Amino acid sequence: MAGKTLYDKLWDAHLVAEREDGSALIYIDRQIIHEVTSPQAFEGLRLAGRQPWRTSASVATIDHNVPTTPFNSAADITDETSRIQVQTLENNTREFGITEFGIGDVRQGIVHVMAPEQGAVVPGMTVVCGDSHTSTNGALACLAHGIGTSEVEHVLATQTLVAKKMNNMRVSVEGELGPGVTAKDVVLHIIGVIGTAGGTGYALEFAGSAMRSLSMEGRMTVCNMAIEAGARAGMVAVDDVTIDYVKGRPFAPKGADWDKAEAYWRTLVSDADAQFDQQVDIDAADIKPQVSWGTSPEMVVPVDAHLPDPAAETDEVKRSGMTRAYEYMGLTPGMPVTEIKVDRVFIGSCTNSRIEDLRAAAEVAKGRQKAGSVKQVLVVPGSGLVKQQAEKEGLDKIFVEAGFEWREPGCSMCLAMNPDRLEAGEHCASTSNRNFEGRQGNGGRTHLVSPAMAAAAAVAGHFVDIRELDQA
């Protein structure tokens, strides 16, 4: 009998029932809830006279709509829709007995930063949230993916989900990452290689020596963008890095329960003889600091490259997409990446707002000044605890002295659902995960980069090769 992949093990451990049509019912260990995709789910429970099946399996926080400037209550939120959604989550969690880290709680933050940070996500879990970037949590060897609002209600009511088993893909990144190359560059490079549809229908396991060399924060960055590679879920096998990260966190097992859990978690690796439906091999030496230039995450090139020429693209659909992207972005084929000027910089999001990310940005910002041509640089920690740790290390002072703005936790400029957004025509060096048209504001132009690359663009006023920053 062939060995099992990590995904196979997670699926089999949670399988409740299967149907002949290929659909299945799987048990869900953890649901993470935020203010945008949950109101209708709670209302559905209320109308049906149901209670959550297991209140302790859910944990909630506010992130998408909250301002990143200081506020003391929901009443301080000026946008009516945002204010109502924040208040509604507070009311719903209170009514149904679900833990929420809300306004004024230091644990409040972006869902996919808060949950692992609290140990609310541990290896071996099935994890869902009404948010596509739930895949972030797969870094902890979980089956984690986004669900729709009706499914949020279904999980609340039954602690199960109707799902269809995905195929297995392994992306192996072998070798040593070069100077200035981060987890963000790794995943942008992967997407550049396989495309935004490359992972469609697959659960992606990220493997190889370069992946194992990443911290847990780095692995979360990679799994976060499995979605942009077309997959629904991304994951990394358990190793010592995983175990060390989880140990001692508030929700994590303790004492004898920890010993039993760790013994099980150590089995959460793909067997040596496991069969994958698709295998992608990448040499770490080929990965350079990346910059996205277009309106899809696959439109990405190394920082020392020139922008590609649509005329060289043989696929007519891709060629048309590239031409449209150039028109939207206001760029010219063949221009060096380092000639792209930026108007604003955003360092944050569920992709890159953890303490490691802020340290990398601060290292670049230290002793330097925001370029006069750059209108704004936002640094937004992923949670109150990340903010607290950064301030303990003095990172906030480094950012402020460089002319950057140090903000409160939230999703911020990743998406135009709160006061932080781009104006039409503005170019933004962003550590977020999506560069679609209008994602950061109507007519805004997004360039996806690592925190260090974003900070370097902030001080130079244009993209620079982080490996040559002192010469820029």
Swiss-Prot record:
Q: Extract one GO molecular function annotation from the record.
A: metal ion binding
Which pathway is recorded for this entry?
A: Amino-acid biosynthesis; L-leucine biosynthesis; L-leucine from 3-methyl-2-oxobutanoate: step 2/4
- Provide the cofactor list for this protein: [4Fe-4S] cluster
Instruction: Enumerate the catalysed reactions.
Output: (2R,3S)-3-isopropylmalate = (2S)-2-isopropylmalate
> What are its E.C. numbers?
4.2.1.33
Keyword terms of this UniProt record: 4Fe-4S, Amino-acid biosynthesis, Branched-chain amino acid biosynthesis, Iron, Iron-sulfur, Leucine biosynthesis, Lyase, Metal-binding
Q: Which residues bind [4Fe-4S] cluster?
A: 350, 411, 414
Q: Which Pfam families match?
A: Aconitase
Q: Could you tell me what the cofactor note in this record states? A: Binds 1 [4Fe-4S] cluster per subunit.
What top-level class of enzyme does the UniProt entry assign?
lyase
Family matches, as SUPFAM superfamilies = Aconitase iron-sulfur domain
Annotated GO biological processes are: L-leucine biosynthetic process
PANTHER family tied to this protein: 3-ISOPROPYLMALATE DEHYDRATASE (PTHR43822:SF9), HOMOACONITASE, MITOCHONDRIAL-RELATED (PTHR43822)
Question: What is known about its subunit structure?
Answer: Heterodimer of LeuC and LeuD.
The family line of this record is: Belongs to the aconitase/IPM isomerase family. LeuC type 1 subfamily.
**Job description of the protein:** Catalyzes the isomerization between 2-isopropylmalate and 3-isopropylmalate, via the formation of 2-isopropylmaleate.
HAMAP family found in the cross-reference section: LeuC_type1 (MF_01026)
Q: Identify this protein by name.
A: 3-isopropylmalate dehydratase large subunit
| Species of origin | Alcanivorax borkumensis (strain ATCC 700651 / DSM 11573 / NCIMB 13689 / SK2)
